[in-house]
Swiss-Prot record:
Keyword annotations from UniProtKB, A to Z: Isoprene biosynthesis, Nucleotidyltransferase, Transferase
E.C. code: 2.7.7.60
Family the UniProt entry places it in: Belongs to the IspD/TarI cytidylyltransferase family. IspD subfamily.
Primary enzyme class: transferase
GO process annotations (BP): isopentenyl diphosphate biosynthetic process, methylerythritol 4-phosphate pathway
Signal peptide (UniProt feature, chain positions): none
Protein name, UniProt field: 2-C-methyl-D-erythritol 4-phosphate cytidylyltransferase
PROSITE patterns xrefs: ISPD (PS01295)
Pathway as given in its UniProt record: Isoprenoid biosynthesis; isopentenyl diphosphate biosynthesis via DXP pathway; isopentenyl diphosphate from 1-deoxy-D-xylulose 5-phosphate: step 2/6
Gene name tied to this protein: ispD
Protein's job: Catalyzes the formation of 4-diphosphocytidyl-2-C-methyl-D-erythritol from CTP and 2-C-methyl-D-erythritol 4-phosphate (MEP).
Amino acid sequence: MYYEVVIPAAGQGKRMKAGRNKLFIELKRMPVIIHTLKVFDAHAQCKRMILAINEEERQDFERLLKVHAFQTPVSLVNGGEERQQSVYEGLKAVKDADIVLVHDGARPFIKHTQIDLLVKAAIEKGSAVVAVPVKDTIKRVQEGKVEQTIERQSLWAVQTPQAFRHSILKEAHEYAERTGFLGTDDASLVEQLHGENVYIVQGDYTNIKLTTPDDLLVAKAIMDAERGY
């Protein structure tokens, strides 16, 4: 089954301290967002890639898309102030896909095998996310004091892509807009719907999100390892 992927790309990534949209930062002489788009462009089930962008950066994105040709159609829509609003605007641009993926533009290392499993899970169960078991000890802290050590066995660090039946994700965003709910990811919006469950597809620890300057060092190491440098 084919899918369309919505990629929120309007954020400025202040923690990266790059002074610009972090998706324009180059890894191995290619912008991060192009690395991410290439993954989906090469995936046979991807029908369309929708970028929710800052209108002020439209020309920058258009210029990149002209330089780097893709076989899969790419659509640009204006995003919102919050990530959730950007995804919603991208979702409105979905045309005829029964399955919709949402993916962080700053995660260029997602693998096709994980996308395959994720799409399969969304078809069968409605909603699924890529995640990895938490490796560190997690503690709840209040005003600098440890209040509780959380049992690690049931904790998973959720990544993207996240995949949903189009109808479910649309209903979740509409409900969030009506109620004013602001979630940290799209799965948290679906969790607000009565009777809807979200399922886990185990991912890979290399599927990092580029958030801080240190992440760029890790990203380069991952790329070197994958290319055998």
